[in-house]
Curated annotation (Swiss-Prot):
Keywords: Cytoplasm. Residues 1-297 are annotated as: Required for targeting the protein to eisosomes. Residues 503-512 have a biased composition (Basic and acidic residues). It comes from Schizosaccharomyces pombe (strain 972 / ATCC 24843). One of its GO terms (biological process) is plasma membrane organization. Disulfide bonds: none annotated. It is found in: Cytoplasm, Cell cortex; Cell tip. This is Eisosome protein sle1.
């Protein structure tokens, strides 16, 4: 790495590697971690060394050197305590790294990056980039050397309230671990004499020339549920909320969306239910259909009244029955369809009956969906149960029972039937029947739609559009914002923008900093004040991303101006269900954002940043390109 100071990518790659090397299961405190990463990346040029002194580089070097040495037990990386990022693992013989360059602690020069309000928001107990003293790791998993020698008492081992750390309090190091596990250094330190807690060197600093002995400040409150992380970048990389919601966003929310359409798609169902014996139909309790005299003395003496539950049809192919308040609650329509039991003498489509013999029975195909379901008919003195021919586009799974109020309509027990086309011998309907049957409905036109029904259907339509069809360039997972609650990280804790704590924003707000006016030529006023503060375009998606919105959010993107848009460090990778964040320059983009005017937004070096350099006239090219280069050199 001869040009180490120029090779910014090496650092980011090392950071990514350290992210990968560490377990992703820890719980982080979002506020301080986000700030710490940003203050690190923002300030890294304020000290001379770029790569060799960088914590990630040290970390990688010490990992490489310690991995080889056989005599020392490696603590599992997820448990490695904080300082092992900077120092070689303490268990081995103390190795002094080649270059002890500056650590990126919060020195007075970089402290100016914090505005006053931020300094109040974050009391001194939250450590900035590398901690100047040991921070207690959690031993919840397996005992590691680093954890039981840590500077503070940890809550799993010491429950005695008198032993909780005060600054000058004496306590015995824990002797519960079997000596076999302990390294010699650990035994030496945990033998029977008492050590004042504040005068012990922290185990990682033990006889290494790195830091002076650290005196821990008294710890105000420490919640044992927040375990402090391992490598600085891995640790700062994401917090609990964002991590879980990244996962949930991609899996759970998507499947929640899909749940309503779990009513199977037409193609699947038709093959699944055609001629199926009742064992395959999702458990429908046996229907008791009451057959009774038609009061209106119509041509047939018997008629069957079925409750009609009109379900929202996810495929949208059956327009006639799109009327339910939501895809999940099926509200029964007040309409009844009268079904006349068939005569055996009729000639029609074959129907498999339950008892096994075939009965002929006419079907009117294609008008309503007929879910296979037994209808009791009285016929030749004995009742056989017929299956009506099935064209299921719209199976209903519902547990509501509809109790009709008028005495004419019988109560039907069991799960209500889906819309069924009346099966009849000669005449199609009896217009005189008390329940005003639907007259030969074609699926395209709904039968007597009330205004309310129409409105409901329109809403369904809209919701389905939003949920099912992915909008241009935005994923279904992202559209989940429309129906689910917005991504938790869409509203950061301090209710400022996601970028408010980045060093860029900080120095801009305080009016200081070299790059304040860097883009003033190219930046519209709106980009400075409003958009970058309120609605960051890179991530997270706005609470309700709609197609129209997507274009509007990008208006300043083409000015090539906004630096946050160009490459946001804190953008969790939303692709491929990945759980952590990677700090490499990835080729992917934030989910619902159309491609930038120039080819690759996340470039490997500042030159390819402007992929379209050829397009500019030479004069313009010089100025703009120089600005970009300067900006990147300073920032990254």
């Amino acid at each position: 790495m001869s040009h180490a100071s120029k090779n910014y990518n090496a650092q980011l790659t090392a950071a990514a590697a350290s992210t990968a090397l560490h377990g992703t299961k820890k719980i982080y405190n979002s506020n301080e971690n986000d700030r710490a990463v940003n203050s690190f990346l923002g300030n890294r040029t304020s000290y001379g060394e770029a790569v060799n002194g960088s914590p990630q580089y040290d970390y990688m070097r010490s990992r490489m050197s310690t991995l080889g040495s056989a005599n020392q037990p490696m603590a599992p990386p997820s448990l490695r305590n904080r300082s092992s990022v900077y120092l070689p693992t303490p268990a081995g013989p103390p190795q002094i790294p080649v270059n002890t360059g500056k650590r990126y602690t919060l020195t007075s020069s970089s402290a100016n990056y914090m505005t006053k309000s931020e300094r109040q928001m974050r009391p001194p107990k939250s450590y900035d980039f590398p901690p100047s003293q040991q921070v207690r790791p959690s031993t919840s998993r397996s005992p590691s050397y680093a954890s039981y020698n840590s500077e503070e008492v940890n809550f799993q081992s010491y429950q005695d309230p008198r032993l909780l750390p005060r600054t000058s309090q004496m306590y015995m190091p824990d002797n519960n671990y079997s000596p076999a596990v302990k390294s010699p250094a650990a035994q030496r330190r945990s033998s029977s004499y008492m050590v004042p807690a504040n005068s012990r060197g922290s185990p990682a600093n033990y006889n290494t020339p790195y830091y002076p002995t650290a005196i821990p400040p008294p710890i105000e409150e420490y919640s044992p549920s927040v375990s402090l992380p391992t490598s600085p970048v891995a640790e700062e990389s994401y917090n609990n909320v964002q991590r879980s919601s990244t996962v949930r966003n991609n899996t759970t929310q998507k499947s929640v969306l899909k749940k309503p359409s779990r009513k199977m798609s037409p193609a699947y169902t038709s093959s699944y239910r055609q001629n199926s014996p009742s064992s395959q139909v999702p458990p429908v309790s046996k229907k008791h259909v009451i057959i009774y005299e038609n009061k209106e003395g119509s041509s047939s003496s018997e008629s069957v009244y079925e409750d009609v539950f009109e379900d929202f049809d996810p495929s949208g192919s059956n327009q006639a029955s799109l009327r339910s308040t939501s895809t999940i609650h099926y509200t029964p329509s007040s309409k009844r369809i009268s079904v006349i039991p068939p005569n055996t003498s009729n000639i029609g489509s074959r129907v498999v009956s339950r008892s096994g013999q075939n009965n002929n029975q006419p079907a009117q195909p294609g008008q309503y969906n007929q879910q296979s379901q037994p209808v009791q008919s009285y016929q030749s003195g004995q009742s056989t149960q017929h299956f009506q021919p099935v064209q299921p586009i719209q199976p209903v799974q519902s547990t509501q029972y509809y109790q009709p109020s008028s005495p004419v309509q019988p109560v039907q027990n069991g799960v209500p039937a889906p819309p069924m086309q009346p099966v009849q011998s000669t005449q199609y309907y009896q217009p005189s029947s008390p329940v005003q049957p639907v007259q030969n409905v074609k699926p395209a036109q709904p039968a007597q739609p009330s205004l309310e029904d129409a409105a409901k259907r329109r809403v369904e339509e809209m919701l389905r559009q939003m949920d099912i069809t992915p909008t241009a360039s935005s994923t279904t997972a992202n559209n989940a914002y429309a129906s689910a609650e917005p991504h938790p990280s869409a509203f950061p804790d301090d209710m400022n923008s996601v970028f408010s704590d980045s060093s860029f924003e900080r120095e801009r707000d305080s009016g200081r900093g070299r790059s304040t006016n860097l883009f003033s030529k190219f930046k519209s006023g709106r980009s400075r004040s409003k958009a970058s503060g309120e609605a960051p375009y890179s991530y997270p998606a706005p609470p309700v991303p709609s197609v129209n919105n997507a274009g509007a959010r990008l208006t300043l993107r083409d000015s090539g101006a906004a630096p946050e848009a160009t490459y946001s460090l804190r953008q969790p990778s939303n692709h491929a269900y990945s759980e952590g964040r990677s700090y490499t320059f990835t080729g992917g983009q934030p989910p619902s954002v159309p491609t930038m005017p120039y080819g690759s937004r996340f470039a490997n070096d500042s030159d390819s940043m402007m992929g379209s350099t050829a397009d500019f006239s030479s004069k313009k090219k010089g100025g703009k390109f120089k600005a970009f280069k300067k900006f990147f050199k300073m920032r990254f």
